[in-house]
C-alpha cells in the first residue's frame, strides 16, 4: 500500500492575478426561467461546492478554456444562473436561470508540477490559493458554478481548480459537465456525447407523503450515556491531519479473502468496511456505542421509472450501515461487508421515494453524530480529463475533510486512493489499522482483539 499521510505537504506560494476574473456567459442565450430543485438537491447538508484539483504537464490557452466554457454552458445553462430562496421562510431554493455566467480566473504561481506532485498526497490550507475566493455574505450570494481557476506553473504546466455547487449536481453530474467542457476545449467542433436533462419534476414528493421506511441515515440513535460523547463534535474539536492511502488490486483481493465465511463482494464494499473498521478502532469509542457508515449511492437506475439518461441533478442518496463498536471491531471482515451489502440492498425505488417525502418536512438531516461518511469518485473517468494538453498528472480534492473520499488512480483502473482527515493523535494508529490484512505477512488478527474502551 502506497501512502502519503505523513509525507511533506507542499506550501503554495501566493498566486499572481494579471487581470480580474471574468464571468463567462453561455455563447447563446435561453429564455430566462426558474428551475425547480428536488428534495435530493436542496438538502442543507449539500449547500457547498464540490472542489476538484487537476495538475497538467502542459498548459492550455485560457482563450480556448473560456470559449469552450461558454459553449458548454449552453447545454448546462443552470450552472450560469444563481440560487434564489423560495417562499416566505426561504428554506427552499430554486435556480434563477438568468445566464449571468460562471466565474473564470487566470493566475500564475512560482511552482513546478514536479514540486507540487511531491507533496500532493497531503492537502493543506495553502492549496485554497489555487481557487479564486468569491466574497459573499451568504451561500445564496455565490454562483452555482462558483469558480474555475487556471493557474499557470513555472514549468509550463497548469493547475485547474473547479468548484461546482452540490445543489446543482452530484459527482456523476460534475464529471458529466467537466468531460463535456474538456471535449469542447480539445475539439471545438465536437458533438457532446450526452445531452443534459435538467428537469427535476420527476423527483417531486408525493401528495400526501408516504413515508414507509424508518430511514436510519437521518434518525439519531437513542440517547447514549455522557461518557460516549459525540464522535462528530469530537472530530470538529481536534487538530486534523490528512491521511492518503492507495490500495492496489492485489491488496484489495487479499482483503476480500479475510472474510470468513467467504462472501462475493465489490472492491467498494470491502474497502468501505475496512476503512470504517480502521477508523472506529483508531478512535476507540465505547464498545456499546451505536455507529453508522453513510455512503453515497447512485439511484438513477433504481427508481421506477428510471431517471432519464444525462439527468443533471442529484441522483444519489446516503445508504446506512449500522452496528455497535463491539460488533464491528471483534468480528472479521465478513460482518462489515455484509452490513454494507444489506445497506445497499435496502435502497430500492420505493425507499428513495419515501426519503424524498420525508425530506419535504425540511427538518431532517443526516445523522453524523457517530457516523463515517464515504463518497466514491471512482469509475467517473475524472482522472482522464483532457482539455487538449494531455491527461492530468494528478487529480484529487482541493481539500481533505473529515468525510472519506475514494479516488481513482491514474494508470490503474482497479486501484483506489482513500483520503480523509483524522485527529493528529490517531493518524499513525489509523494507518496501522488500514494496513492490516493487506498481505500474507500482516493478516488481520481481530479474533483476539477486544476493541472499545467502554
What is the role of each PLM region?
Residues 336, 355:
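Catalytic core of tubulin tyrosine ligase-like
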Residues 1-224, 232-296, 300-311, 315-316, ...:
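Non-catalytic N-terminal regions of enzymes
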